[in-house]
Amino acid sequence: MKIYLVGGAVRDALLEQPAGDRDWVVVGADQAQMEAQGFKPVGKDFPVFLHPRSGEEYALARTERKSGRGYRGFVVDADPSVTLEEDLLRRDFTINAIARDEETGELFDPYNGARDLQARVLRHVGPAFVEDPVRVLRAARFMARLAPLGFTLAADTAALMREMAASGELDSLVPERVWQELRRALSCAQPSAFLRTLHDADALRVILPEVDALYGVPQRAEFHPEVDTGIHQEMVSDMAARLAPGDALVGFAALTHDLGKALTPPEEWPRHVMHEQRGVAPLQALCERLKVPQDFRQLAIIACREHLNVHRLAELRDRTLHELLVRCDAFRRPERIAQLALVCEADKRGRLGSEEAAYPQGEALKRLHAAALAINARDLAAEGLQGPQIGEALTKARIAAIAAARRIGA
């Protein structure tokens, strides 16, 4: 019985990057032996155990044979005779197929993952890559994480991904897994690499058709020197990751704020009048399909509808700005205003030549919201107002507070 550290922990150590959870593989053991040593079985589909003290996951070495469509269609063999090399062969990428002996620290690298780490290449381990559609998503997500370190996708891996997209294999992806990988990608430093990798593989049209439809749609060059809305979307996603590192909530709203531009009739290009309203329906469809959590949905819809209003904040009347705050539910959910400001700043700076531009609208929005938020119903009730009178007086007082804050900030 031999134990090896495998996967991301080994990879990240070699990259000198912070490591997450540690995963272990056990060679030459069966379930009875593991339980005899105090390990607790937890795997439903695979022979996985929790260490009795550390709680870390230990999996028996296994092979997987394709038996059906999708990522669940596999027959697993975890016989004690399965070798470490056979176990590593089933893994997705060479950089994840490196093992380290728990006792000696020696690396076991039969598929040259260390060489690919050195060359900064993301490459599939073997032909079985095409058997699991989730690996297309994982390739894109790893690129979102590793592209800032100089990684590129191996040409043969990119070719396999295109084959998988063309074969219809991606149709078997379950919504929950798509959302999981998208959310993780939006938490990475370069989400554009996720989008670009999938788009180049012709997989984005299957996974996120609402986003894929933005590519090739022109915008006015005086406002968008990058012209292509798809490229703008990539830049906005990266800017959101820069402004709010690791914040997938802001990242998702940034990703989906311009979906309406794909619905602009071509004869109206490059203008996109009312795209902020047109974008709500495809955004809601995307959220329904992927079962997106409510907090993500709500902020994304707010950003989609309101980003142009925030851009022209100085032009809004005090009452109009108050109405915007009400639509954002900003008096019950005050955190939304800072989030909305970040999305709008990412939109404004996610353009060629504007990456370092100032965005005073964001700070102004937060300041005016804070002034309105300082007015509360309890104070008005203490003055003897009751029922509808309180609501009317509260609105009037908050609008007055916005006006006063504007005069001070002018």
UniProtKB/Swiss-Prot annotation:
One GO biological process term: tRNA 3'-terminal CCA addition
Protein origin, superkingdom: Bacteria
Name of protein: Multifunctional CCA protein
Required co-factors: Mg(2+); Ni(2+)
Classification lineage: Bacteria, Pseudomonadati, Pseudomonadota, Gammaproteobacteria, Lysobacterales
Note: A single active site specifically recognizes both ATP and CTP and is responsible for their addition.
Annotated InterPro entries: CCA_bact, HD_domain, NT_sf, PolA_pol_head_dom, PolyA_RNA-bd, tRNA_CCA-adding_enzyme
Entry note: cofactor: Magnesium is required for nucleotidyltransferase activity. Nickel for phosphatase activity.
Residues the entry annotates as binding Mg(2+): D21, D23
Domain HD: from-to ranges: 229-347
CDD domains assigned: NT_ClassII-CCAase
Family the UniProt entry places it in: Belongs to the tRNA nucleotidyltransferase/poly(A) polymerase family. Bacterial CCA-adding enzyme type 1 subfamily.
Assembly behavior: Monomer. Can also form homodimers and oligomers.
Protein residues bound to ATP: G8, R11, R91, R138, R141
Designated gene of the protein: cca
UniProt keyword list: ATP-binding, Hydrolase, Magnesium, Metal-binding, Multifunctional enzyme, Nickel, Nucleotide-binding, Nucleotidyltransferase, RNA repair, RNA-binding, Transferase, tRNA processing
Purpose: Catalyzes the addition and repair of the essential 3'-terminal CCA sequence in tRNAs without using a nucleic acid template. Adds these three nucleotides in the order of C, C, and A to the tRNA nucleotide-73, using CTP and ATP as substrates and producing inorganic pyrophosphate. tRNA 3'-terminal CCA addition is required both for tRNA processing and repair. Also involved in tRNA surveillance by mediating tandem CCA addition to generate a CCACCA at the 3' terminus of unstable tRNAs. While stable tRNAs receive only 3'-terminal CCA, unstable tRNAs are marked with CCACCA and rapidly degraded.
